[in-house]
């Protein structure tokens, strides 16, 4: 079963971002709480990488981040949803949202983690095939860099497509995981130009977060979380009662 979607304009992602910023300013306590959670997780990853002195811990750390990220985002979606309904958004109510339809959400989080682990295995395989000669010319590495980049882009596109609207859909309409995944994939496929812009905005926010040693997450993740809720509401067709 796939829930139908609307067609959105190329500039829509910037509108969602402005709505997310508006919610961020209007709900300082909730924004600060979830921002601190995201920031703590990001700082933990940065410190772990520095302490281990190796990039090998980056991907496992990101798998953990992929597992906890959707659950933290649920609280932000709930807060935006409450404001949309004209209710007072409270931190306690947003935290309760994390337990709503939890079996589907856990299944989805595990699926995301499996995708990340698969990605790690592909990356490790490509790395093992790299020329081992020190000082080998760049042309020897070029095919592996191109293949690695293409595989990474395809996997990133798939993960983004199945996850763009799945979590808010499971929270609001309590649908099963497969309905949410197919609906999200269909919505992204039907709005490719706008979704490329939205994916770039999200990547930019996460990069700013990590580039500032996790501190930027305090601001970027709540704004992106609220923005995702507005993106979901504008893209997925509403229920007709």
Language model segments and positions:
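Hydrophobic alpha-helical membrane segments
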Residues: 1-241
